[in-house]
A protein has these predicted regions:
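Membrane-embedded alpha-helical segments and adjacent helix-loop junctions characteristic
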Residues: 51-138, 290, 295-358
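Alpha-helical transmembrane segments and, especially, the helix-loop junctions at the ends
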Residues: 110-120, 137-174, 179, 191-196, ...
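Juxtamembrane and boundary regions of transmembrane helices in multi-pass small-molecule transporters
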Residues: 135, 174-222, 375-378, 382-423
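Long, contiguous bundles of hydrophobic transmembrane helices that form the permeation core
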Residues: 188-278
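Hydrophobic alpha-helical transmembrane segments
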Residues: 9, 36-37, 97-104, 118, ...
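Interfacial loop-to-helix junctions that mark the boundaries of transmembrane helices
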Residues: 1-6, 26-29, 51-61, 173-183, ...
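Hydrophobic mid-bilayer segments of alpha-helices in multi-pass membrane transport proteins
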Residues: 6-16, 26-47, 59-70, 231-241, ...
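Hydrophobic alpha-helical transmembrane segments in multi-pass integral membrane proteins
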Residues: 46-50, 156, 160, 240-246, ...
Length: 423
């Protein structure tokens, strides 16, 4: 092994260890800081040159994420999530209905916009609604986290790792959605059933009849929201962006450019029609830490590639192909890595090992890295957000509370994924 390859290997191991443990003694190390430090070491040790740093950063992925984040920030400012809560309230007459409606809405929104943002906005609403009807919020919070991850599987913009896979694989947005939406729908049904079974005492009486709830109490917890022109402007742009995604092949424009143009338009237009909103609040709604995390990983993995380390790693996967065996093998590796180092770095590490043009394995990587995150609280960022937000409002989701629903959901949905994509 050459010196540069050995250096790249040591930096790679050190950085991924930091990303995994997120702590050095008593000092907390956030994932973006760990990734950027690894990138810095690659440059300082001469593994990556200055020119290669610029070359490593994939502007397509950054543009897609940034554009969608700006649009979501504008939706939040104009009251989308309050309106969704009001709609949810109107449809619920018992606790089980509240569960499947809240999970369904969470999954749908997570397919359209980044799932982390959905749970960030939706968790306080769920806790507030549960408190108003004297219901245990734990089943609803666990269901929300599972639904957010499952719903995000359906499209290339539901979560960061899917956005990365969408760009790297070259799979058209429409084909991506058509291939994975059925799996997402079936997985959601499985999740609703398992959550209802695990938490049946909170949802049903002894005769297995759903506990009724007083809609007037729900209405008080989530009053009607008046929608004004700024909301419809943002919603119109979101719809236009998704139409652009569907027609991206015909338009000859990458989805990243479509999302970025939509975000830029709203960044300028929304402050003009909503006088109490400037560009500052919109930009504060962007997850800049995720952008920096991607930048650091891009440079780190460029070092892995240029040093020859990637070629050594790829040798172990030369015989991986489609079919049940190939999909199952990738699913196991991806699932384990996603729970050890989180799904985004796992996907970026495994993606060079996918044979060129093998859409089945790309889709398998998307499903396994996302669905595996449902196993434990730490398996996905959305889970952590739900748990931390709930805890801040006095609703504690314990590790076992999550595990007893999340683990069976993960095992069943991963098996469904292997069968659906492998056969």
């Amino acid at each position: 092994m050459q010196t540069v390859t050995l250096l790249a290997f040591l930096v790679f191991l050190f950085t991924y260890a930091l990303i995994s443990v997120r702590r050095v003694r008593s000092v907390s190390i956030e994932r973006p800081a760990a990734a950027l430090f690894g990138a810095l070491l690659m440059v300082l040790l001469g593994v990556v040159t200055a020119d290669q740093v610029v070359e490593a950063i994939d502007l397509d992925i950054i543009g897609l994420l940034l554009g969608m984040m700006i649009i979501v920030s504008c939706l939040e400012i104009t009251g989308l999530f309050d309106r969704v809560a009001s709609t949810m309230v109107d449809r619920c007459g018992d606790r089980f209905t509240l569960l499947w409606v809240s999970m369904g809405i969470t999954a749908l929104l997570s397919a359209l916009i980044l799932n982390d943002t959905v749970v960030l906005m939706f968790t306080p609403i769920i806790v507030k609604v549960c408190r108003s009807i004297d219901a245990n919020p734990i089943p609803y919070l666990v269901g929300e986290a599972l639904a957010a991850n499952i719903g995000s599987v359906a499209t290339g913009v539901g979560n960061p790792q899917n956005a990365y896979i969408l760009i790297q694989s070259g799979i058209p947005f429409t084909e991506f959605a058509i291939a994975l939406t059925p799996l997402a729908v079936m997985s959601l049904l499985v999740a609703v059933a398992i959550v209802a079974l695990v938490f049946r005492k909170d949802l049903f009486d002894e005769g297995l009849r759903p506990h009724p709830i007083d809609r007037s109490l729900l209405a008080a917890a989530s009053p009607k929201v008046r929608l004004e022109f700024p909301f419809f402007l943002v919603l119109g742009v979101l719809i236009a962006v998704f139409i652009g995604f569907l027609a991206s092949s015909w338009l000859g424009m990458p989805v990243s450019l479509i999302a970025f143009l939509g975000g830029c338009f709203l960044l300028l237009a929304l402050p003009l029609v909503k006088k109490d909103t400037g560009t500052g609040p919109i930009l504060r709604g962007v997850d800049w830490t995720l952008i920096l995390f991607f930048v650091g990983l891009f440079i780190l993995l460029k070092g892995v590639e240029t040093s020859g380390l990637m070629a050594l790693m790829l040798g172990s996967f030369e015989d991986m192909g489609a079919g049940v065996a190939g999909v199952a093998g990738l699913t196991v590796v991806s699932s384990v890595l996603s729970n050890l180092i989180s799904n985004v770095p796992a996907v970026m590490l495994l993606s060079p090992m996918i044979p060129v043009g093998d859409d089945t394995l790309w889709l398998s990587l998307a499903t396994s890295s996302t669905l595996a995150g449902n196993a434990t609280i730490l398996g996905a960022a959305a889970n952590v957000i739900v748990v931390e937000k709930g805890l801040s409002m006095g609703a504690e989701v314990r590790f076992l509370d999550f595990l007893k629903a999340g683990l069976p959901v993960t095992l069943v949905t991963l098996l469904m994924s292997v069968l659906l994509l492998g056969l």
